[in-house]
Amino acid sequence: MSTDDREIEVYRAPVYRPGDKVIARKQVKNDGTMAGFEIGDIVVKKGDVGYVRDIGVFLSQFYIYAIDFIERGSIVGM
């Protein structure tokens, strides 16, 4: 699949804004990018509540949301 075949998400406004409340739809495991957790550790469980802290861009194509899961004490890029 070429880049031309995929939607460029950043051509439209982000779905979420900083401060928005979000709920995890899936469990998230550490892929090795989160300090303080072993690879494979669960960092977010389905149903956990978090708040959008920041919005970044990945590969000039996709939005990445920094979600602050306050009760877990972790910020996860999703």
UniProtKB/Swiss-Prot annotation:
Which Pfam family is an annotated match for this chain, by its short name?
Answer: NifZ
Keyword Zinc in the entry? The reply is: no
Output the superkingdom of the source species.
Answer: Bacteria
Q: Which InterPro entries match?
A: Nitrogenase_MoFe_mat_NifZ (IPR007415)
Which UniProt keywords are given for this protein, alphabetically ordered? Answer: Nitrogen fixation
Please name the GO terms of the biological process aspect recorded for this protein, alphabetically. nitrogen fixation
Give the protein family: Belongs to the NifZ family.
> What's this protein's name?
Probable NifZ protein
Taxonomic source organism: Rhodobacter capsulatus (Rhodopseudomonas capsulata)
Tell me the organism's taxonomic lineage: Bacteria, Pseudomonadati, Pseudomonadota, Alphaproteobacteria, Rhodobacterales
Per UniProt, what is the name of the gene that codes for the protein in this document? nifZ
